[in-house]
Amino acid sequence: SDGKDEIVVGTRADQLHAINDNGTNVPGFPVAFGGDVNGSPAIGDVDNNGDLEIVVNIGNGTVVALHHTGATMWTRFIPNANFFAPSPALGNVTGDAKLETFIPSSNGSLYGLSDTGADLPGFPVVYSTTTYTESSPVIADIDADGLLDIVLGSEEKYIWAWNRNGVVLAGFPLSTGDAMRGVPTITDLDQDGS
């Protein structure tokens, strides 16, 4: 609450750092985990209490949400899954003013987690039976129905899109003809309002 931004970054040395503008550690950091911190941390007010939380994926198949103090909010282990490059995405998909977490895993499934780390209804969803993705999900209202959707690129040459209930949107998956490792960008490029 000093009006200055901090830098939050994970390392291959199993730690999450939060660093002040003068190079010192934020109190409570670094936080140590039992695996590499992969991808970028996602930051938002997950529980709608006015404070920011941090959500990270750990290379051992764990998703962790932390309070801004570094204390653990919740931990969720995903069986048979190791996380690689993808970063979690946060969004108020259910409309309850709290943020849900979406993260793809190496077992070919996209997980949707509530503000407490529990599975959302309709999740996980399968995006691949043969491979994983290095892409991160994006949350946007791509069908212009006023509700947020989840979009993910895959190594199997498809772009997937699901609604908040885990139902694949009409017209998806879309074939791109090649694997995707980057994160999709969502915009109204033709400015037609959808």
PLM-predicted stretches and their roles:
Residues 1-194:
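Extracytoplasmic/lumenal domain signature
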